[in-house]
């Protein structure tokens, strides 16, 4: 399934929506004003655009997501790996771990993911 592109400022909006949903558009205006410094019109414009692209649903002023945070993050990572690492997950991991230390707990968690994938399960 193709997921709609969520731009950076829209993603910050979505983080708020995902945290509070279902949430009224009026509540989102207040939250975006407090957390992002947005004006009322900016919030309503983003709600309209994301609704048109299938990211959220605005049903009589109640906003809910149609794309989950996990789905949006997975799509962004897929795009990043494809665009910057020529589709190579090992190249991405090598670049990430070159400058990013991982704790023993994180390494154990990654190993469990690999083990599940090898057994035919999902992450």
Name the predicted role of every residue range.
Residues 1-16, 71-72:
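Short alpha-helical segments that sit at the start of domains
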Residues 6-9, 22, 86:
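Short helix-coil-helix linker/hinge
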Residues 17-21:
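Short helix-to-turn junction characteristic of helix-turn-helix DNA-binding domains
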Residues 23-32:
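Short acidic, hydrophobic short linear motifs in intrinsically disordered regions
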Residues 44-48:
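Short, hydrophobic-biased segments on the C-terminal half of alpha helices
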Residues 51-61:
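A short, conserved structural fragment
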Residues 61-68:
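Minor-groove-contacting beta-hairpin "wing" of winged helix-turn-helix DNA-binding domains
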Residues 75-120:
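Amphipathic alpha-helical dimerization/coiled-coil segments
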């Amino acid at each position: 399934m193709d997921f709609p592109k969520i731009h950076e400022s829209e993603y910050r909006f979505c983080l708020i929506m995902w945290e509070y949903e279902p949430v009224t558009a009026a509540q989102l205006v207040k939250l975006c004003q407090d957390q992002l410094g947005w004006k009322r019109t900016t919030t309503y414009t983003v709600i309209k655009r994301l609704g048109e692209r299938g990211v959220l649903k605005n049903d009589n002023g109640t906003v809910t997501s149609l794309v989950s945070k996990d789905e949006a993050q997975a799509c962004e990572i897929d795009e990043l790996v494809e665009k910057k690492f020529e589709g190579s997950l090992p190249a991405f991991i090598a670049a990430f771990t070159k400058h990013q230390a991982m704790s023993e707990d994180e390494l154990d968690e990654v190993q469990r993911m690999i083990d599940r994938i090898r057994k035919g399960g999902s992450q």
